[in-house]
């Protein structure tokens, strides 16, 4: 079992608050396209990219304190991305258009995975030869 200290918990809380505020702002700035909630897709893809970049960067030699790592990954990326909103919006889209709901769900999952891989590739480019 991993020991979690008060500093890591505080870091997760701060990162989560920052991520949630960013999600709220980004989701509000990005308009829906024909009922398609692009803001949620954007925050999920962005958060997936950042998480892939940070986790792969640490594997390639980037040194982050446990607090900074917790703040950035679990806190910020966790607060930025949103499974519950994606699930709700999928159900709402299903009422109007089953095809659109499937496209939305697929876009979130496929683009999220692609973003993690893209973040990992970007980290490799940034950190190759520096370790």
Curated annotation (Swiss-Prot):
Na(+) binds at residues 78, 81. It catalyses: fluoride(in) = fluoride(out). GO terms for molecular function: fluoride channel activity; metal ion binding. The chain crosses the membrane at residues 10-30, 36-56, 71-91, 99-119. InterPro entries: FluC. It comes from the Archaea. It is found in: Cell membrane. It is a multi-pass membrane protein. It holds the Pfam family CRCB. GO terms for cellular component: plasma membrane. Coiled coil: none annotated. Keywords: Cell membrane, Ion channel, Ion transport, Membrane, Metal-binding, Sodium, Transmembrane, Transmembrane helix, Transport. The keyword Ligase does not apply. One of its GO terms (biological process) is cellular detoxification of fluoride. Belongs to the fluoride channel Fluc/FEX (TC 1.A.43) family. Fluoride-specific ion channel. Important for reducing fluoride concentration in the cell, thus reducing its toxicity. HAMAP family: FluC. NCBIfam families: crcB. This is Fluoride-specific ion channel FluC. It comes from Methanopyrus kandleri (strain AV19 / DSM 6324 / JCM 9639 / NBRC 100938). The gene is fluC.
């Amino acid at each position: 079992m991993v020991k979690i200290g008060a500093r890591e918990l505080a870091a997760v809380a701060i990162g989560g608050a920052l991520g949630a505020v960013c999600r709220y702002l980004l989701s509000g700035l990005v308009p829906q396209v024909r009922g398609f909630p692009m803001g949620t897709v954007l925050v999920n893809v962005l958060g997936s990219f950042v998480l892939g970049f940070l986790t792969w960067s640490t594997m390639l030699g980037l040194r982050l304190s446990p607090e900074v790592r917790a703040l950035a990954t679990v806190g910020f990326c966790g607060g930025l991305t949103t499974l519950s909103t994606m699930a709700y919006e999928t159900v709402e889209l299903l009422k109007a258009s089953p095809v659109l709901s499937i496209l939305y769900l697929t876009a979130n999952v496929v683009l999220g995975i692609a973003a993690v891989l893209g973040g990992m590739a970007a980290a490799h480019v940034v950190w190759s030869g520096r370790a």
